[in-house]
Design a protein with these regions (language model features):
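Hydrophobic faces of well-ordered beta-strands that scaffold small-molecule active sites
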Residues: 1, 54-59, 82-86, 113-117, ...
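Glycine-rich, proline-tolerant flexible connector loops at the mouths of alpha/beta enzymes
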Residues: 2-7, 77, 81-101, 149-161
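Short, small-residue-enriched loops and turns at beta-alpha junctions
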Residues: 3-5, 60-64, 90-95, 120-123, ...
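N-terminal amphipathic alpha-helix/helix-capping segment at the start of soluble metabolic enzymes
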Residues: 12-67, 71, 106, 174-185
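Conserved anion-binding
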Residues: 26-36, 141-213
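Acidic (Asp/Glu)-rich catalytic clusters
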Residues: 44-49, 73-80, 99-110, 131-139, ...
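Short, acidic/polar
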Residues: 63-76, 98, 124-131, 199-209
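A generic, well-ordered mixed alpha/beta core segment in the N-terminal half of proteins
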Residues: 117-119, 125-150
């Protein structure tokens, strides 16, 4: 048990402490968030000033090796291509993700890229996550398209999503940008126009609706 001697020893130890404990260092004020720095987009600048632009489509590889692809992109850049456009699993066959390939090309070559983004394979959450990643990597253009349907023979194993159509996808992408929103500046959305559509008047009307959105 505690005896008077213990209490006296405790009192002596307390008396030996300094009268005031040192104050904790003052917290430094948090740095203000830096405004988003926009990348210089040579492709959009040429497009908006009416200059001729050269866009070349180069499908992503079917395997995990990007060596030959990057070399091909480098040669196209040297030949004068302003933009590399990358299909999103064309004819619904799996290839390396177009957005990830676009990020790699943009990061390593400094080349403008236009990854295609289909409605076929992603729901809203997956679409938003991918767009945020593209923005963080400096990719500021996407092509919003419906996407080729899954071949009938594969539909038991591979499922369509189609939470959006291409017009709603374009509208959703635009809605993510602005003050207080997820993206400080917008991603430019491009659309497709099928010149060989069976009913071109309908196709043209749909294109006009995309522009309105």
């Amino acid at each position: 048990g505690t005896t008077p001697q213990h209490i006296a020893a405790l009192r002596t130890a307390l008396d030996a402490l300094p009268e005031a404990l040192p104050a904790a260092p003052a917290a430094k004020p948090a740095a203000a968030a830096k405004p988003a720095v926009e990348t210089d987009d040579a492709f959009l600048r040429k497009l908006r000033t009416g200059q001729r632009v050269i866009a070349v489509e180069l499908d992503s590889p079917k395997d995990a090796d990007l060596t030959a692809y990057l070399e091909g992109a480098r040669r196209l850049q040297a030949a004068g291509a302003d933009l590399l456009t990358i299909a999103d699993c064309p004819i619904a066959r799996a290839r390396m993700d177009s957005s990830l390939v676009a990020c790699r090309v943009h990061r390593e070559l400094g080349m403008n890229v236009l990854p295609h983004m289909t409605c076929r394979d992603r729901n809203l959450n997956a679409t938003k996550a991918l767009l945020l990643g593209l923005y963080a990597e400096g990719v500021r253009e996407v092509l919003a398209i419906t996407g080729d349907p899954i071949p009938t023979a594969e539909r038991d194993e591979v499922k369509n999503v189609y939470q959006f159509n291409s017009r709603k996808l374009a509208q959703y992408i635009v809605s993510l940008a602005g003050e207080g929103r997820e993206m400080p500046a917008p991603i430019t959305v491009f659309g497709a126009l099928n010149l060989n559509a069976r009913n071109f008047e309908v196709e043209l009307r749909r294109a006009a609706e995309k522009l309105e959105n």
